[in-house]
Design a protein with these regions (language model features):
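Glycine-rich loops and low-complexity Gly/Arg-rich segments
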Residues: 27-32, 62-67, 90-92
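Local sequence-structure signature of Cys/Sec-based thiol-disulfide redox active-site neighborhoods
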Residues: 1-37
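Non-catalytic, surface beta->alpha helical segment in thiol-disulfide oxidoreductase systems
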Residues: 67-94
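Thioredoxin-like thiol-disulfide oxidoreductase module
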Residues: 39-61, 90-94
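Short, glycine/charged-enriched secondary-structure capping and boundary segments
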Residues: 19-20, 55, 80
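Short, structured active-site "lid" loops
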Residues: 55-73
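Residues at the C-termini of beta-strands that transition into short coil/loop
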Residues: 9, 42-44, 80
Length: 94
């Protein structure tokens, strides 16, 4: 399983509020190490990796998680609690 976290950077260069909140939750629970890669959707750069992948998966909010399992379509999670319950908890990671 491969997990990608996409976070949004605002025009002033700061992380969006929800992105900060999710980052803090991941850090507090020791889950940040379970994220394989983090991409930044920088509103100042329409070609940033995060914006490009958001377009690819038709996601319009951040943060979001992309969960890739071998032989399956990628799953997109835009709600942290659902991601934690469906991905982290079954994997014995909570």
């Amino acid at each position: 399983m491969k997990i990608t976290l996409v976070k949004k950077v605002l025009a002033d260069g700061s992380l969006c509020g929800k992105c900060r909140d999710v980052q803090e939750r991941l850090e507090a629970k020791g889950h940040l190490s379970l994220i394989d890669r983090t991409l930044i959707a920088d509103v100042r750069d329409p070609q940033s990796a995060g914006i490009t992948i958001a377009r690819q998966y038709k996601v319009e909010r951040a943060p979001f998680f992309i969960v890739e399992r071998e032989g399956q379509e990628a799953e997109i999670y835009t709600i942290y609690a659902k991601f934690a319950k469906e991905v982290l908890q079954p994997a014995g990671r909570l």
